[in-house]
């Protein structure tokens, strides 16, 4: 009976750890604790938005940096440049382009034969997809107000892009677990 209980507990613990939506890593060379909390994916008329909240702690400077990263995939990047975000606490942050890349995606029909990949009749569409990552810096006081547990457990922000507005929301309760985990790792490094 005792071994079954331990096995069930081990499986449950493994499942909970594997389902985490965040990552925290420490780089010993630069002495920076970096974290990312995955909020999820939102779709608009012209593209796909993937949002991540990131907190960095620099041990040498004893300083934290809070920001939201937005990854945008679109077929026409001139139509979908995130200009700013506004949180539900009315904080506004301007976007800064961090990285851009493009990739070619080819969709094939059901009769596609991998032995003859150059058969032009099997291609349905080809798309050149632009991938851009934007960074929105948030001050520490505004960030704490934004994620503080209050009357409701949902935090939200709106991404304003050219002809595309997307509302992104997330639950504050699992986010608080991520924040507590990050703060405990900062304390282990001797920070406050």
From Swiss-Prot:
This is Uncharacterized lipoprotein BBD10. Residues 1-18 form the signal peptide. Disulfide bonds: none annotated. It is a lipid-anchor. It comes from the Bacteria. It is found in: Cell membrane. Transmembrane segments: none annotated. Its main location: membrane. Keywords: Cell membrane, Lipoprotein, Membrane, Palmitate, Plasmid, Signal.
């Amino acid at each position: 009976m005792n071994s079954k209980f331990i096995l069930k507990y081990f499986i449950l613990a493994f499942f909970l750890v594997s389902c985490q939506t965040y990552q925290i890593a420490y780089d010993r060379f630069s002495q920076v604790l970096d974290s990312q909390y995955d909020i999820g994916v939102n779709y608009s008329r012209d593209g796909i938005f993937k949002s991540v909240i990131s907190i960095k702690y620099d041990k040498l400077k004893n300083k934290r940096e809070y920001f939201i990263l937005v990854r945008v995939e679109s077929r026409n990047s001139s139509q979908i440049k995130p200009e700013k975000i506004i949180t539900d606490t009315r904080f506004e942050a301007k976007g800064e382009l961090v990285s851009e890349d493009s990739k070619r995606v080819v969709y094939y029909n059901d009769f596609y034969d991998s032995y003859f990949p150059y058969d032009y009749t099997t291609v349905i569409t080809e798309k050149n997809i632009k991938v851009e990552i934007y960074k929105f810096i948030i001050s520490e006081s505004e960030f704490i107000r934004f994620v503080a547990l209050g009357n409701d457990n949902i935090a939200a922000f709106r991404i304003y892009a050219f002809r595309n507005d997307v509302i992104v929301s997330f639950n504050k309760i699992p986010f608080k677990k991520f924040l507590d985990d990050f703060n405990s790792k900062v304390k282990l490094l001797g920070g406050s």
